[in-house]
Amino acid sequence: MKAAGAKQRGSARGRRPLVGKLVIFGIGLIGGSLALALKKRHAVARVVGVGRSRANLLAARRLGIIDEIAGDPALAVQDADLVLLAVPLGQTAAVLAQIAPHLGPHTIVTDAGSTKRDVIAHARKYLGAAFARFVPAHPIAGTEKSGARAAFATLFDDHKLIVTPEPETDSRAVRKVSTMWKVAGLQVSTMRAADHDRVYALVSHLAHVLAFALVNQIAGYADTAALFGHTGGGFRDSTRIAGSSPEMWRDVCLANRDSLLAALDDYLEELELLRGMVEASDGRALEARFAAARAARTKMAGEKKLKRKDAEGAKTTKQA
C-alpha cells in the first residue's frame, strides 16, 4: 500500500473550483458528505443529484447538499466533469449501463463501493473506451446511518481512501479523483483490487456480518425483550454497525463472496478453538488467547491513536 502524499485541503474562494459539475448517483451518507465537504471548501461549482427516492433528493436539495435534481440522468452526465457512483453495489452495473452511451469525451467516472473487483468488471463491460477514465475508489469512512440527512461535511476528515486503478486507467483521472477526495479530508493510498477485497473482507465485511449475527442471535430467544433490556456498553459497541443498511451489506456480502467466505471459515476456526477451551475449563489457555488479542489490538495502530478512535466510536454510539 503506497501513501499518495499529504492531504490537500481547500480551494480558495474566487479561484476556479476543482470540479465544475459533479453528478452523484446516490445522495446518502457517502455521496452527500462528499458534496458537503467539497462545497465547504469551495471545490465544486455545481452538484447534481440522482436517486431512486424523490423525497430523499428533495431533502438533499433543501439541506444544500445538491444544487439540482436530475430530471434525466442521461442528460445530466453529458456535460459532467465527474460522475460519482455512491449507490448500493447491486445497482452499480445498471447505472453504468445507463450512463455509458451519454458520457462526454472527458468525463471521469468513479465509485465509492466497498468492493472493487466486481465494480471494475462491470465498468470494463459497459464503459467501453470510457473505461480508461473510470477510477475505482473506496472511502474508508462511514457511520451506521444512511440517507441524505445522515450526511455531514467532516465525515472524511483524517480517514483513508483506497484507489485500485487498472493498468489502462488514465493517470490524469486518478490524480483528479485522488485530489477531490484529499480536499474532502481523506488520505489516499493505492492497492490492487484483489488485495483490497481480501483485506476489507477481513477487517470490515466480516465485522458487519458478525454484528448482524449477534443481534439476530439475541433477538431469536423467547425472552428477547428482557435480554435487550440488560445490554450494556459492550453489546452496544459490538453491535452498533448492525444498524447499517441491510441492502448495502447484502450487496457487499454477495459481491465479495469468496473473500468473505474465507474470512468466515477462519473465524469459525477461532470460535471452535475458544469453545474447546471453555468446554475444557482451560482458564490458562483462555487468558493467554485473550491476552494475545489485547496485545494485537493495542499494537494495531498505537495505543494513543486507538484510544482516540475508541472515543470517537463511543461518541457515535451515544448519538445513535
Question: What are these model-predicted stretches?
Answer:
Residues 2-72, 77-78:
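NAD(P)+-binding Rossmann beta1-loop-alpha1 motif at the extreme N-terminus of oxidoreductases
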Residues 4-8, 12, 308-319:
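Short, low-complexity, charge-dense intrinsically disordered segments
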Residues 73-108:
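Rossmann-like NAD(P)-binding element
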Residues 86-88, 113, 165:
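Glycine-rich, N-terminal phosphate-binding loop of Rossmann-like dinucleotide-binding domains
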Residues 98-149:
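Rossmann-like NAD(P)(H) cofactor-binding subdomain of soluble oxidoreductases
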Residues 153-240:
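Internal alpha-helical scaffold of NAD(P)-dependent oxidoreductase catalytic cores
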Residues 224-293:
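Interdomain hinge/lid region at the active-site interface
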